[in-house]
């Protein structure tokens, strides 16, 4: 009986062990199936997310890529300016003009009882037109090279944000030189008048930059800056017109043909800049690149035409 009881107890314990092992195996199978289900659900979720991302990428519009003028165009422009400078230095006449400074002086004949002052003009220096033109072309070449190399990243940022300060730096420097060349060709030789006209061109560039910056920041046109640019742009135009009229009325002669063409080129270039500036508010952000290219193209054409006109007008056979 004792042995039978022992055998029964052993069978009970073996049954319990088998039950425990079967339960543990079933629990392991259940956990494995849960892990598989979780992996499958995560894989489905990932596939859905990737499909959604792909569909969103396919449906979302591509952002416009801002590109500036290529280095080849800048290099070709610099080469053109260098060639024109070489032609001007070799083929143009050595026509010199004097720079005067107006001042008051004592009239020795009339100053008997007291000092009598009269207006006078003192010649300061003589300068050749061709070297002024060569200087303009050389400075333009340097600015073109800088804008394509050292200032290339600033060019991209300017187009991206809708404000191009480097363009207005170029406008101020080369525009002031253009005005002085055109003024000297037409007989405006007073130092103060020449510098006033050059300073007015720099003010136009400053007001244009302020207008562009405020328009990009607020989206509203800055009327004060625009009016300031237009008013200051009238100063060099009126000075050139008065000088041309004085030549006809008091000089009883007409200026040479290249002097009239030079004035026309300068006024057309200045008018185009003001026209494009006035239309800045109607230009979208994505059209700013086209506007910047138009500025650069017209500026290059104005300098090239002015150089060709003066070379042809002051040409001398070798």
Q: Which sequence ranges carry the predicted segments?
A:
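Intrinsically disordered, polybasic Lys/Arg-rich low-complexity tracts
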Residues: 1-59
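Polytopic alpha-helical membrane-helix bundles and their juxtamembrane interface segments
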Residues: 63-166, 175-318
């Amino acid at each position: 009986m004792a042995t039978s009881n022992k055998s029964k107890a052993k069978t009970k314990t073996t049954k319990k062990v088998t039950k425990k092992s079967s339960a543990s195996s079933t629990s392991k199978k259940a956990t494995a199936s849960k892990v598989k289900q979780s992996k499958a659900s995560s894989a489905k979720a990932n596939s859905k997310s990737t499909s959604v991302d792909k569909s969103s990428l396919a449906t979302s519009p591509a952002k416009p890529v801002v590109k500036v003028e290529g280095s080849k165009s800048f290099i070709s422009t610099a080469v053109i300016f260098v060639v024109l400078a070489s032609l001007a230095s070799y083929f143009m006449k050595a026509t010199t003009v004097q720079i005067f400074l107006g001042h008051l002086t004592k009239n020795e004949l009339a100053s008997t009882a007291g000092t009598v002052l009269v207006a006078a003009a003192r010649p300061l220096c003589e300068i050749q037109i061709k070297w002024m033109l060569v200087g303009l072309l050389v400075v333009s070449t340097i600015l073109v090279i800088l804008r394509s190399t050292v200032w290339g990243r600033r060019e991209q940022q300017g187009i991206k944000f809708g404000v191009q300060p480097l363009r207005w730096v170029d406008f101020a420097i080369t525009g002031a030189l253009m005005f002085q060349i055109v003024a000297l060709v037409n007989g405006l030789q007073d130092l103060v008048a020449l510098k006033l006209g050059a300073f007015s061109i720099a003010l136009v560039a400053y007001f244009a930059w302020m207008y562009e910056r405020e328009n990009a920041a607020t989206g509203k046109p800055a009327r004060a800056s625009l009016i300031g640019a237009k008013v200051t742009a009238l100063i060099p135009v009126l000075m050139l017109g008065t000088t041309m009229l004085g030549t006809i009325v008091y000089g009883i002669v007409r200026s040479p043909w290249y002097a009239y063409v030079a004035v026309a080129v300068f006024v057309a270039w200045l008018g185009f800049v003001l026209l494009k500036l006035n239309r800045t508010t109607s230009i979208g952000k994505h059209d700013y690149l086209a506007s910047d290219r138009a500025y650069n193209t017209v500026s290059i054409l104005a300098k090239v035409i002015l150089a060709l006109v003066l070379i042809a007008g002051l040409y001398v056979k070798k």
